[in-house]
Amino acid sequence: PNIEMEKISRPMSDWDYVYWGAPVSENIYSQIPGFLDKRYRWQSGTATGSWQNLGTTLPGQGFITRIADVAPFNVTPTAINFTMKGTANNGYVYVNVDSYDSSSIIYGNAILLSNPYPCAIDAATFLDHPNNTELGGTFSFWTSFTPISTSNPGPDTYNYNEADYATWNRTGGTGTKASTDTTGNDSLRPTGKIASGQGFFVHAFADGQIEFDNSMRLVSNVNTQFFRTSQNALANLEPEKHRFWLNFKDNSIAFRQMLVG
């Protein structure tokens, strides 16, 4: 069926990046809002990998966009509204992947994928699929929590903070900011329920095809974790496990979270 799916981000500022994916089969490049001035895809397969200009969106492949230095984003943090229109993806979705080697946790083995469906998918079911055995077990989600800064390490004058990748594996998720309530719902911590339109990194240790199918799709109300500042409680439901989180923070914005399980 034809759909119109609106994705609403948490409040964001100029220069922030958002990781997306198309829930429809058509190329939605022309639908990207004009204030998102930089648009890239990730090219794996070399030792370092590289960002390439985006020209076409494909189901299951992630892409990123940057917010331009324009109002209202350069005045006050504002949510992004991105409406994606087209034929909803359904059934099998295959993504060709190119790895650098069979074992290294390096940029060249990282692949940028996305949930190809207009509903959430379960990360564990995705990993368990017999055609996805070449994948590593950790997913990385960009939160864009730390402002771009000259104090962040990197090759440019102003750089982003790599610690802004929240992660999830079978033990659980680690966030990028300290929770301000007792539930932890606003800690930007992934739950393993990947929302529609969400792009993410995972490592691949062999060339081939990654497969998505309908067995991974979730039909209950868990399609909410697109890294807003306030999460729906249902999106944070996880199986009971024996584990605990250690938060390390200082009086500035610096924060690290460690999961032990």
Give residue spans per PLM region:
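Self-processing/autoproteolytic domain segments and adjacent N-terminal interaction modules in large
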Residues: 1-101, 243-261
